[in-house]
């Protein structure tokens, strides 16, 4: 296969937590670095906290509604790794190609994510059990 990969890098690992107030100090101690950024992502009904680790990040996800995907995840698993996110150049092109190939998607169109990024999720049934998030950074052509 000679085509160039759509993936630029692993952007972050998403970790579901019941409480950012409890998790942030624990991760600051474990990682030896302060939290870099916190943000509410209303569309996904979560509060997030990011820690930079090289070119990638740990993203802590706290639900803000009982019916949010993170709340449902926590009800089954009490916490832990939720998803892996990869940065792509052109999320619309990647989604179009996956749809053409019949890849099972959670999001058929990109939506708003943290940091002003456009995101979409691929269903775990299409990835061997891993929830994979695609992320396009605004003005990513300037990287």
Describe the function of each predicted region.
Residues 1-6, 10-18, 49-52, 59, 71-97, ...:
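Vicinal oxygen chelate
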Residues 23-28, 51, 98:
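Conserved active-site tyrosine of GNAT-family acetyltransferases
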Residues 26-30, 42-45:
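An N-terminus-focused feature that recognizes amino-terminal "leader" regions
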Residues 32-40, 102-109:
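Short secondary-structure junctions
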Residues 36-37, 67-72:
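A short, acidic/glycine-rich surface segment
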Residues 41-57:
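C-terminal "cap" of GNAT-fold acetyltransferases
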